[in-house]
Amino acid sequence: MTIERRTVLVGAAALTAAYATPVQASTRIPLRGMNYDTEREVWLTPYVRHDIKAIRHQLHCTGILLLGSDLHRLTEAAEIATAEGLKVWFEPRQFDKGARETLAFIKAVGHVAERLKAGLSLGCELTIFMDGLVPGKNYIERAQALATTPDYNQRLNNFLATALTTVRSIFHGPITYSSGVWEDVAWQGFDMVGIDLYRDSSNEKTYASDVRALHRHRKPVIITEFGCCTYRGADKRGGDGFDIIDWTKNPPVIKGHHVRDERVQARYIDECLTVHERQGVHGTFVYNFIETESPYMRNPKLDMDMAGFSVVKVFPDYARTGRWAPKLSFHTITQHFK
């Protein structure tokens, strides 16, 4: 059994009626933000500052979720974002590391978050991205092993309880966790419910009720990740849309005959944001602002941007120029957030 991002919340629709009151009209989301991944080959302060200014002043975001494993980069981006007036949230990542290293890095980021009065997520989908909760050498093997590891939620919650205790001793701001839809998190000790919730063919009819059901925990809800790639049919694949690249080729190529279509991404984000507004979430973070190693190319077989979630497209000369251009989805987000 392979667990993909498109796996839906188990029992969400059934729980909706019992625990959540439908929100009838759109409400303005307080925390309107973008994911900003600090893991990249090119990291230049002027480029980062330009990106973050665009997030604040062109997209009209109120928040930013910083992802990464480099404390210096996370700190630099957070300081720039704070100066621009964004509410910073950190999501420290130590993929494929064990509990000790993961916890140490969360604590290190917690010190920075305390100084900057930021928010903190304790990680991303740790059952597949952290070593030790589920058997496997990487996230693919661990995802496949979920079905044969019945106590993985207990293991996850034990780790999160330890992390909460550790972080609360040095950090006094809001804490959440960026959960996978297959994870059953004990949210009692958290300030907010966080979930990476993509829409795809398996949950497009229940997406609104899945979001609404999250209110059963009686805490503010943050959609920590959602987004769509940039080709026809990507809206049906949701978080798995990136998997159309043949990495065995040199250079890598797009598999099959996919057709670039920015309208698909824009429409998907528009529809999901509308759901988030109507269901009264506290925060939503679009994934992702920029993917610098996935440049746009006119040749569709080489157009790595097609397989990316970013709302801006970079060009092959990015390392030298920092040049990017907004996609249609960029303007869609602006209309929702301004």
Predicted regions span which residues?
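N-terminal secretory signal peptides
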Residues: 1-3
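Boundary/entry segment of secreted carbohydrate-active catalytic domains
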Residues: 26-54
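Active-site groove signature of glycoside hydrolases
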Residues: 109-153
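Aromatic-lined carbohydrate-recognition surfaces of secreted/lumenal glycan-active proteins
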Residues: 157-183, 223-225, 286-287
